[in-house]
């Protein structure tokens, strides 16, 4: 089974009812499967922070949302994540392609890769990095966990730390 099929099956198994996507070469196969499936509402976004708003609306309308995006846009989504998704405790799995690793041909992608995990850690958002195709087999359990609790823990006091 392809990684795209594993991702699609995991979303169906976890009753994902709404997906927004931003164009991504690495995730183009799964985006195409979502578009063709008819099993969930798919609304392409122009920007990742716009997608956060769409996902919040879908959640408030009774659907389980997910967003598919690139890690290079984490910087522009920080405000939407903190003041919308986290503040209103919206569970939102983010399937993020990870640009900028060894072999990346685009230099600016490398710079954001250096900061991606640290930015998500700062927001207390757990991350799971798939290095091999078979790692995607964990996605159904990860999605299930993500929908049991909000995307992050927001009720922390200054002296507490994030729990992942």
Predicted regions: what is each one?
Residues 101-104:
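A short acidic, helix-capping loop that chelates divalent metal ions and anchors anionic groups
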Residues 2, 22-26, 46-50, 72, ...:
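Short beta->alpha linker loops
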Residues 1-9, 14:
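N-terminal amphipathic/basic leader segments beginning at the initiator methionine
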Residues 28-99:
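Thiamine diphosphate
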Residues 108-145:
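Conserved thiamine diphosphate
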Residues 15-19, 40-42:
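Short active-site oxyanion
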Residues 18-32:
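N-terminal glycine-rich anion-binding loops that anchor highly charged ligand groups
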Residues 155, 160-164:
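Single conserved hydrophobic/aromatic residue that forms the stacking wall/gate
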């Amino acid at each position: 089974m392809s990684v795209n099929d594993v991702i699609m099956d995991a979303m169906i198994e976890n009753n994902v009812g709404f997906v927004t996507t931003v164009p991504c070469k690495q995730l183009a196969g799964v985006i195409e499967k979502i578009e063709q499936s008819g099993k969930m509402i798919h609304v392409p976004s122009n920007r990742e922070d716009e997608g956060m708003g769409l996902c919040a609306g879908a959640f408030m309308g009774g659907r389980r949302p997910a967003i598919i995006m690139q890690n290079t846009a984490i910087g522009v989504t920080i405000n939407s994540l903190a003041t919308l998704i986290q503040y209103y405790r919206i569970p939102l799995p983010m399937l993020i392609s990870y640009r900028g690793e060894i072999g990346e041909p685009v230099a600016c992608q490398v710079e954001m890769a250096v900061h991606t995990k640290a930015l998500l850690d700062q927001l207390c958002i757990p991350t799971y990095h798939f290095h091999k195709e078979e790692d995607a087999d964990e996605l159904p359990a990860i999605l299930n966990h993500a929908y049991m609790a909000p995307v992050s823990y927001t009720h922390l006091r200054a002296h507490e730390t994030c729990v992942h």
